């Protein structure tokens, strides 16, 4: 599974995504559930549409799928997701996103694609933070107690990294001060982390030895 990990929005490697379209296809599924931390309304909808438009401008044919529509319908969701080879997971609240991935079975679906080089997981902010093995340290910048789905906070991430990502570091972003606080907290508590400035993109893949 190829990974395109951005601090904010598309980031500074759009040519990588354009190359993906040329070599594969332009279908992409946008996952918006980190935004379930916010109430439904025009502002939330407009934000999701703005993310979708950025992908459209690159040449993608975007389908927005809310994992919330498939809670306790894991088989149905898996069948739908099989028609996509690329996903874009947007920013919001990491803990809410993790819960949505669990309740819908999206996390288990990803596991079936780990060794597939023709599968792309792209995302930014919460969409990359959720990839860590353990989410402790992210609670400084994301509220872990927000509970839109009625289940307990999940501190285990997807398990692809043994450190957390801290996006928006030293950036022109409203959360950059919270990221500074997160860095301080992680240093104090010996939590491993990697900072990204807005614009930064990390390219990686999961076809390697992973510690669960």
Say what each PLM segment does.
Residues 1-24, 34-46, 54, 137-212:
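C-terminal and late-domain segments of enzyme folds
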Residues 25, 59, 83-84, 161-162:
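Short, well-ordered alpha-helix to beta-strand connector turns
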Residues 27-29:
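Conserved beta-strand elements of the Class I
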Residues 62-119:
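Flexible gly/pro-rich beta->alpha loop and the following alpha-helix that scaffold active-site loops
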